């Protein structure tokens, strides 16, 4: 067991600034209006830094820097851009622990997840898109003896990116890596709840990227996010967040006829078929862990398996074992490597989760475990902690239909394959799903029948590069973490060339 020290305290691997300006043109820039907002850590609930409260003027300044940098960066040879991405990956890897501590203090997640998943995935995604870029090819089409069509991939230019608060670094990397690989300059707005860790990363890689290629502007959605998304000087906007906000982003982008990619909400079903319990073996234990994945990252995951659908024939036994597994989840200091579930990212989110627990109870759902705020005592007593909560109820209830974004799972039973698929698809969302079965035919048929962009089969919450990620229905547009994302940050130039000396003879 290792308990890392809080930033700025004796023995800590990192100190954070008492005030953060915006990162524009490769340097710190104070907000145009000179305003800042206090930022608390979810770990203790105490304020620890001030963050630039930016406006449209700061967005314009960042766009100036991005437009100044974009032409040269876009002309950089693919091999050189790939090498830059590789150096960024190396730098993250060299400072993994410092970045993990910053991420925990910013977001509240347990450091075991940041060290084992978030940061290694960030490293791998930069390396992946470096490789994808080197392997990308244009095309040549010979249309007839004298006419050839050449197709070139060209960067869009300057793009806007708006990042959520649940994975502040990893979600930023998911967007930055393909955008940079494609040759774009970026203006990025982090979530106001988690503005710090990305700025720590900017300082770490300042000597690697040309100034202005990445610019980070902090602030609130209406004051900084909207001026970015609606700005005619960006060629694309990428957004991860809540579905209603995603609709607004689409409206803003439509005014300038620019493309969007959106990764939005979810209410993911996790299906456990009867043969899961055919033996009490490693697979059964794996399935129980798959059930408990609703508590990963405190349930603050768009693909949180927040609806558990269990076959009627194994319902009581499997649910009993799942309850035991959930109650064994260790909640504690997020900086302790033994802690499995940390703090919610903000007090607002804490209150939202608690309100949904009240809603579920009022609807008649039964709380099987959890259902309350947790006071960890001492310096952690003001932190934003919720016990992992299991409801038993009906898929028509709000807790089954609405995204809670917390460590809350709603459980119901199904009677046969058709009933399982019907319940799974009875949702507005279609981001993720899980299927657990020992039967390959059931696994394949269920995976194809579920209306979701990512269906984990006998696994859950794996996010490797080269596996496309994105939603159906109200869960978004576009695919990330795959080479196809490079296309979202490029436009195709066609040169249609005639090598004949003779004209067509029309005039």
UniProtKB/Swiss-Prot annotation:
GO biological process, one term: protein homotetramerization
Record-listed NAD(+) binding positions: 219-225
Keyword terms of this UniProt record: NAD, Oxidoreductase
EC number annotated for this UniProt entry: 1.2.1.69
UniProt cross-references to InterPro entries, sorted A to Z: Ald_DH/histidinol_DH, Ald_DH_C, Ald_DH_CS_CYS, Ald_DH_CS_GLU, Ald_DH_N, Aldehyde_DH_dom
SUPFAM superfamilies noted in UniProt: ALDH-like
Record PROSITE patterns: ALDEHYDE_DEHYDR_CYS, ALDEHYDE_DEHYDR_GLU
Catalytic activity: fluoroacetaldehyde + NAD(+) + H2O = fluoroacetate + NADH + 2 H(+)
Active-site feature positions: 263, 302
Alphabetical list of Pfam families matching this protein: Aldedh
Domain of life: Bacteria
GO molecular function, one term: fluoroacetaldehyde dehydrogenase (NAD+) activity
Subunit architecture: Homotetramer.
Family: Belongs to the aldehyde dehydrogenase family.
Record's function text: Catalyzes the oxidation of fluoroacetaldehyde to fluoroacetate. Has high affinity for fluoroacetate and glycolaldehyde but not for acetaldehyde.
Entry protein name: Fluoroacetaldehyde dehydrogenase
Biological source species: Streptantibioticus cattleyicolor (strain ATCC 35852 / DSM 46488 / JCM 4925 / NBRC 14057 / NRRL 8057)
């Amino acid at each position: 067991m290792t308990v890392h020290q809080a930033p700025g305290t004796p023995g800590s691997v990192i100190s954070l600034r008492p005030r953060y300006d915006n990162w524009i043109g490769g340097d710190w820039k104070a907000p145009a209006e000179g305003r800042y907002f206090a930022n608390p850590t979810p770990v203790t609930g105490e304020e620890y830094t001030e963050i630039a409260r930016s406006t449209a003027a700061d967005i314009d300044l960042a766009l100036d820097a991005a437009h100044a940098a974009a032409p040269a960066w876009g002309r950089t040879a693919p091999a050189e851009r790939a090498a830059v991405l590789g150096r960024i990956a190396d730098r993250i890897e060299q400072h993994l622990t410092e970045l993990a501590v910053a991420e925990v203090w910013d977001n509240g997640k347990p450091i075991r997840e940041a060290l084992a998943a978030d940061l290694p995935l960030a490293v791998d995604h930069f390396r992946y898109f470096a490789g994808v870029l080197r392997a990308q090819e244009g095309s040549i089409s010979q249309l007839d003896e004298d006419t050839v069509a050449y197709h070139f991939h060209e960067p869009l230019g300057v793009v806007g990116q708006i990042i959520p608060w649940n994975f502040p670094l990893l979600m930023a990397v998911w967007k930055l890596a393909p955008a940079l690989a494609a040759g774009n300059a970026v203006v990025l707005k982090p979530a106001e709840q988690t503005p710090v860790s990305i700025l720590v990363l900017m300082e770490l890689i300042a000597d690697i990227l040309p100034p202005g290629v990445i610019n980070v502007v902090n602030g609130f959605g209406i004051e900084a996010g909207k001026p970015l998304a609606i700005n005619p000087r960006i060629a694309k906007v990428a957004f991860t967040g809540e579905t209603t906000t995603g609709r607004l982003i689409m409206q803003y982008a439509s005014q300038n006829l620019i493309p969007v990619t959106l990764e939005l909400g979810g209410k993911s079903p996790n299906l456990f078929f009867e043969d899961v319990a055919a033996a009490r073996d490693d697979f059964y234990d794996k399935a129980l862990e798959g059930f408990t994945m609703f508590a990963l990252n405190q349930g603050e995951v768009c693909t949180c398996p927040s609806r558990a659908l269990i076959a009627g024939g194994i319902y009581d036994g499997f649910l009993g074992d799942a309850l035991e597994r959930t109650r064994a989840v260790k909640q504690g200091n997020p900086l302790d490597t033994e802690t499995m579930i940390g703090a919610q990212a903000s007090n607002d989110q804490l209150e939202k989760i608690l309100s949904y627990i009240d809603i579920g109870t009022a609807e008649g759902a039964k709380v099987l475990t959890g259902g309350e705020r947790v006071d960890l005592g001492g310096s952690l007593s003001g932190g934003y902690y919720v016990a992992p909560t299991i409801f038993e109820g009906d898929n028509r209830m709000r807790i089954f239909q609405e995204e809670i974004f917390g460590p809350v799972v709603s459980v119901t039973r199904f009677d046969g394959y058709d009933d399982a698929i019907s319940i799974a698809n009875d949702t507005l969302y279609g981001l993720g799903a899980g299927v657990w079965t020992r039967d390959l035919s059931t696994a394949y048929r269920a995976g194809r029948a579920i209306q979701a962009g990512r269906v984990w089969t006998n696994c859950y919450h794996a996010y490797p590069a080269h596996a496309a990620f994105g939603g159906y229905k109200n869960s978004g547009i576009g695919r990330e973490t795959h080479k196809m994302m490079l296309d979202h940050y490029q436009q195709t130039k066609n040169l249609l060339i005639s090598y004949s000396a003779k004209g067509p003879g029309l005039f």
